[in-house]
Amino acid sequence: MSKFNRIHLVVLDSVGIGAAPDADKFFNAGVADTDSDTLGHISETAGLAVPNMAKIGLGHIPRPVPLKTVPAEADPTGYVTKLEEVSLGKDTMTGHWEIMGLNITEPFDTFWDGFPEEIIQKIEAFSGRKVIREANKPYSGTKVIDDFGPRQMETGELIVYTSADPVLQIAAHEEVIPIEELYRICEYARSITLERPALLGRIIARPYVGEPGNFTRTANRRDYAVSPFQDTVLNKLADAGISTYAVGKINDIFNGSGITNDMGHNKSNSHGIDTLIKTLQLPAFTKGLSFTNLVDFDASFGHRRDPEGYRDCLHEFDRRLPEIIANMKDDDLLLITADHGNDPTYAGTDHTREYIPLLAYSASCTGAGVIPQGHFADISATIAENFGVDTAMIGTSFLADLV
């Protein structure tokens, strides 16, 4: 019998909690990630008031310096720790895959100088559209449309760009290049980037709207991932007849592998929380895992290096956390974590190599406190043990610590 009939895993995309031990091997604009600290620096520079996460125990997570504006509550209601990544990457897919039990020992390919001409020409031949060569390099997703959106509106050319992550992104104004056409082009780009020397983790469709000087990316983003190279705990659950519900871009990240119920993409964090709550209320969802990604922290504020906006986004989630808990059953378990860092006060515009926080709450637990520090895959090991599925993947279960 499962200790918890339902587990709800919520990934606050990019909400790291301090530089990882190997942060010196990862860089932003030539600066090592050694001083990155997403939550810490937001707390220091913008102020951070998250009383509901603090009540679970956020302020108790061991750190060299306590979070400046998040107190260590005297009587926390949950269990907390921080987790370290072992995989060779600091991107969304690597983080999520490791959380589900995989160790990425060979990183995907990244293109610091842009994509080879061969790839660009293939995309042009397939699409019948030219590619703006000046955009073909690592670029902030918002800056690239500011810089080249006006030209695209005039010429219909494609904006193809990358980042420090193993991704190929295609930005297209929805009134210039129809959504379905953009999706077809991205599907083709996916088909030509499945093996070295161009093995990419994701192809991302990045539609936007608006006028020059006031462009806005829309919720019609779509990710085209590769399937995990071996089974994750999602597959183990699905194979055992245990339901898995994906909220937000989770289905894209795993390419549908191991997902029994895709609840759709999020238009915003608030919409994602609404979808999670609707999922919790489903009469058919009596046992299994819900897996939610809330991406606004990362996409709207981390990459844009906007600590105040990031703070406000955290405040919004914290205000709605009681709603999530109110829709849980007594024998449910809520796990709140992240997939990497994206310090909005740091150099560059890309992710930062950090520990991730872990907050665990269940009404059925009578204890609380700090549990041993571990690794991302401890989450998958805990889920596997709870539901009694066989797993030979990495990770150490902390299920016994939740009492």
From Swiss-Prot:
Residues engaged in binding Mn(2+) 1: D13, D339, H340
- Tell me the Gene Ontology biological-process terms attached to this UniProt entry: 2-deoxyribose 1-phosphate catabolic process; 5-phosphoribose 1-diphosphate biosynthetic process; metabolic compound salvage; nucleotide metabolic process
Molecular-function GO term, any one: magnesium ion binding
Q: How is the cofactor bound?
A: Binds 2 manganese ions.
The reaction(s) this protein catalyses: 2-deoxy-alpha-D-ribose 1-phosphate = 2-deoxy-D-ribose 5-phosphate; alpha-D-ribose 1-phosphate = D-ribose 5-phosphate
Instruction: Show the disulfide pairing.
Output: none
Question: Superkingdom of this entry's organism?
Answer: Bacteria
According to its UniProt record, which cofactors does this protein need?
Mn(2+)
Identify the EC number(s): 5.4.2.7
Q: Where does this chain mainly localize? A: cytoplasm
Annotated positions binding Mn(2+) 2: D298, H303, H351
The subcellular localization recorded is: Cytoplasm
Indicate whether Transcription appears among the record's keywords: no
GO CC, sorted alphabetically, is: cytosol
Listed pathway(s): Carbohydrate degradation; 2-deoxy-D-ribose 1-phosphate degradation; D-glyceraldehyde 3-phosphate and acetaldehyde from 2-deoxy-alpha-D-ribose 1-phosphate: step 1/2
Give the keywords, sorted.
Cytoplasm, Isomerase, Manganese, Metal-binding
Q: Which InterPro entries match?
A: Alkaline_phosphatase_core_sf, DeoB, Metalloenzyme, Phosphopentomutase_DeoB_cap_sf
Q: Which Pfam families match?
A: Metalloenzyme (PF01676)
What the record says about family reads: Belongs to the phosphopentomutase family.
Report the protein's function: Isomerase that catalyzes the conversion of deoxy-ribose 1-phosphate (dRib-1-P) and ribose 1-phosphate (Rib-1-P) to deoxy-ribose 5-phosphate (dRib-5-P) and ribose 5-phosphate (Rib-5-P), respectively.
In terms of HAMAP family, this protein maps to: Phosphopentomut (MF_00740)
Protein name (Swiss-Prot/TrEMBL)? Phosphopentomutase
